[in-house]
Each structure stands twice: as structure tokens, then as C-alpha cells.
Amino acid sequence: MQPFIDLKNNLSFEDFKTEVLNDYKIAVMSRECSLIGRREVLTGKAKFGIFGDGKELPQLAMAKAFLKGDWRSGYYRDQTFMMAIGELTAQQFFADLYANTDLELEPMSAGRQMGGHFTTHSLDDNGNWKDLTKQYNSSADISPTAAQMPRLLGLAQASKIFRNVEDINTNNFSVGGNEVAWGTIGNASTSEGLFFETINAAGVLQVPMVISVWDDEYGISVHAKDHTTKENISEILKGFQRDNENKGFEILRVKGWDYPNLIETYQEAGAIAREEHVPVLIHVLELTQPQGHSTSGSHERYKSAERLAWEAKNDCNLKIREWIIESGISTNEALTEIERTIKRDIRDAKKNAWTAFLKPIQKEQQELLSLLKQVASSSVNGVFISKIKESLAKIDEPTRKDILSHARKCLRYTRGETSSEKKQLANWIDSIFENSQSKFSSHLYSETNQSNILIKEVKPTYNEDASQVDGRIILRDNFEALFSTYPEVLVFGEDTGNIGDVNQGLEGLQETFGELRVADTGIREATIIGQGIGMALRGLRPIAEIQYLDYILYALQIISDDLATTHYRTRGKQKAPLIIRTRGHRLEGIWHSGSQMGGILNLIRGVHVLVPRNMTKAAGFYNTLLQGDNPALVVECLNGYRLKEKMPTN
């Protein structure tokens, strides 16, 4: 490791020292959260834990290059980064681990996701956009490995649209398209097809993204030799490296324990992506995983003694500690005192988070104990109900399941009784379920006045001598009107641009509105949807075209796991009103019923599924969807493009 690098102009040694020590404090805080978090899971206070220990230093370097307005699309190891940009406190970390349903205390998902899934709030309490250029932005994580990659592509492409499309409204969304989309992924997950599909698409589109690969040589118990050709992802991606004649990626490598070079590498990557709109891949090598993959097991089961010894010696937190002392920035004694203070603070944060989690549940416990006492006094089964009360009272740290199971058990003992005390208990149980609706089941769809189902119907109007035209003409003319009215609307897909889609519903629109707004793509359905999700998260109104319904299976995982859950898993704090356009449902083909519709209806709850009976209906659906804020899938009738319909006047 180099002894000292001054990366900022006019930065004095004292200022540099302050910055380094602040980074060290964040690294220690994050590590201590990981260590205590694991213990909390193993003692039963949380169901599962997956943490970012061993990845602290590169995330600190990434945070220094990450500017307000930028976006993150990462995964469940990025807690240090979120702490470094000021979007995650230690107490929120534990509130997340305990799945606290109070959004004020657990702003990542209000307890809807497992720990380690991070987000920021793009919307205010009324569902209106905040100024995203004045805050650090993180799209909401999901658990499937590599599924963050398609969305990353769209987040980056939005900057290209904002920079290059005239008359587009950038207020609250962009400052000249200068925003970078930062993605993170583990080395093992680069084996997923979604990763390679995203890499290829980003190289074609030339969008400002920086992908960090955190490489600790393992994917749970499986070594890199079983994951990656040559055991090195940046080595096999060399063909994507740009040169003087061909566009592509800038590919950088850096060791994950080398603090000065990490900072330099991330500054370089950010500048390339931001200024040149060139995608960058940073392969961060020689990282460790001190506690293994997760709380599901121990890495001593599959790592050799030699590997474990190497990890202990090359732990990035240990390395920066050694470097700080060797560079004269601080002393062993001073760092020890910092560590002691932080460990005490983390213990306090954990305690406060647990107390805050328990408090409302214990309040419900006391309410129920009082009700049980009253019911027991009036019931013929009072002896048994008193035993239920005693059982509940003995639970020091109850769950809501404990409370409701005791309450409903009491109701069973009062069957046939009509006392006011029983009625009061039943009403109390109903109120708990009603309150639970907002805690656990709200915001699957928009709950604002922008919801599509609240938009007033406008019926088509016709002249007496209305001409009969092909259905595709109605679609085409309606799309032209929409594109003229809404500069933020864009459409893209296979054969969508140059020929105006395979059924000519977009005929001539690329020539009118340009290749950025009416675009062709490669054959890559998952990242077509990812483009749409990312751009919709940034305030654009994309229409992502899947050429035929049959091909939607390639993208169904992303639609189901990411798009359909965006509003729900952020409890209404992010939205991605993407419109997916496709055609089919002819009841022909290899499928026994000729349609994937049954699976679609069940797998993408959270997305409206619309099947217009003709192209006039289809046009109306698109008009309604663009006025609202829910995502939707529109399946146009494949037989309807050449059928004659009256041309509406509106």
C-alpha cells in the first residue's frame, strides 16, 4: 500500500487525516454492526442475517466518488456505502434486521425485506417526486443475485436521455445528464446471464455506469474455479475493453485492501462515466468474508486453514489500520480508543433499536392482558382464559404472533357467549388486523390520487363519416400524439425503431422523434425491461416493447421480482410506472393453452395486466397509463393490426 496519496487539491495533511480517520470510524462501525448482527440472528432476535463485512474499504472509496443525483443499484453487502453517504445509521441497521414496520425507524423497507436491502426515498408522503438531484439515490434492492443489473442499465441510460433529448423536463431529475449509476455485485453472481446481458447492452448503449465486482473468490461455498473461466471476471471481459477504434468498457482492477489506490480508482471511474458517458467495470480483488456468507452456516466448513489464515491477515479493516499507523496519521492507542467508543455506541444502537421494536408490541400485550382479565371474569370458561392470560404475561419479548394467537384462543373459549367483554375483545382483534393491513400489505399499487384506476374514462368520439382504417393506424397516430405531448415518453424494443415495430404500430415515429426516443434494441428481453425500470425510477415514462408475449418468459423474473414489487417493498417511497407493450395471446403455439397468461396473472401482482379487445381500446389504455403512476403490461391482440376500425376524432 502506498504511504500517502493526496487526491484533492488544496487538501492539507490535517484535513486528509480527519477524512481518513472518519473513514476508519465508518469501517469500524460497519464491521461491528456485522459482528453484533450475526449474534442477534443466532440468538433468535432476527430470522436471517447477511452482512457487508470484508467489503468496507472499497465501499468507502465508492462513496467518495458518488455525488448527489447519482444512483446506486446494488445488493445486500453494501451497508458500509450506505453509512458513508449518510443514508444508514447503526440504529436503522438493527431496525432493518429486526424488521421494524415503522417507516420512520426503518426507512429501507418498513420491515418488508430482509436485512441488507437498501433504498432511499424518491417520493414524498403524497407520492410526489422529491428533487432527486439534491439527494443521494439508491434504487431498492432485491434478493435474487444479479437481478440488480438490468435496472442499473436503465438508471444509467436515463442520464443519456436527459443529456441528449431536447425539450425534456429535467427539473428534479437531472443536471445535464451528469448523473452516474453505480452498480455492485459479488464475483460469483457474475456467472448469471443477467450480468452478461447487462454488460453487453451497456457497451452498446454507452451509458454512464460504474459496476463494482466485490471479489472474495467464493460464492457461498463454491470457489471461483467453479464459477468463472480463468477464475477472473475482468480477464474474460477483456474483449469489452474500449480502444482507439471501438467503443466499449473501461475496465479497472484494484485490490480491496489498498485504501489510497481504491480512492484513486473510483475517482477515475466516476470521472470517465460522468464526463464521457462510458461504462466502467471495477474488479475489486483480494477481498475477504470474515463471517462467511451469512448466518446460515460457517465458512470453516469449506475454506482451508491456509485460506482462513490469509483472510485474517488481509482483512481490509486490518490493512487500513496498519497503514494509518505506518503513515503517521494516528497511533495504535488512539485507534484503540476509537474502536472502544464505537463498539459501545453500536451496542447502544442495537439496544435502542430492539427497545423501539418491542415497545408497540408490548403495548398491545398489555392491552390484551387487560381484555383477557375482563373476558375471564364474565365467561363460563374463565379458568381456562385466565391460564391464557398467565401464559401471555410470562412472555418478556412477545411477537405479534404470540399476541394474536393468545387472543384468538380466548375467542374459541367464548363460542356461543354474547358478553360485551367478548365483543370488545373481538373488536380489538379486528383493529389489530386492520392496522396490520397498512403495516404488511399496503402499497402494492399506487394509493395516491395519481392511481390509474381513479382516472376518469374518456370514450372515443367519431364523425358520422368516420373512415375505416387498419387498427395499427389508430395505434400509430395515438402514439404520435403522445410523443408530441410528453417529451419524457420513449419506446424501445426489438424492431421498434427503424421499421416501427413488426406490425407497424410505430411506423415513421423514429424519423419524427429521433433514435433516442424510438429505439431499436438487441434480442435481450430481461434488460429491455431493466432499461424501463431504471428510467421510470428516474422520472421518465418508458414503454418497453417485448416483441411477442411468448418472449416475456425471458423477462418474467425481472418483472415479478423487481418491477411488480418496487412500490410495495419501498412502502410507497419509490415508483416505476413502466409500460410494457407486447402482443400475442392467440391461443396458438407449443403451450398447451397457447398462452402464458395464467402464470403472468399470478406472478406479477403489482403490475396491471391489460388485454385490449381492439386497437382503439389499446390506445385508450396507453393514454390512461401515461396519466397514472402504476406499471402495466399491455397485451395487444395479434390479429387486430389489419382489422378495420373507425378512426376516432379524439
Regions found by a protein language model. Name each.
Residues Y76-F81, I185-S191, V213-G219, K255-P260, ...:
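Acidic, glycine-rich active-site loops and adjacent beta-strand->loop/helix elements
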Residues D258-H283, T331-A334, F384-S391, Q547, ...:
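Phosphate/diphosphate-binding loops
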Residues K459-R571, S593, N602, V609-L610:
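Glycine- and small hydrophobic-enriched segments that form the cores of compact globular domains
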Residues E32-S212, E217-G219, H223-Q241, I590-H592, ...:
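Cofactor-binding active-site loop characterized by glycine-rich and histidine/acidic residues
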Residues M1-P58, K64-A65, P290-F513:
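Conserved acidic/glycine
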Residues S138-I361, N602-N650:
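Glycine-rich ThDP/TPP pyrophosphate-binding loop and its adjacent helix/strand module
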Residues A99-M108, V204-S212, R517-D520, L563-R583, ...:
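A glycine-rich helix N-cap at a beta->alpha junction
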Residues V41, F48-K55, Y75-R77, A110-G111, ...:
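Active-site nucleophile and cofactor-binding loops and adjacent substrate-binding regions
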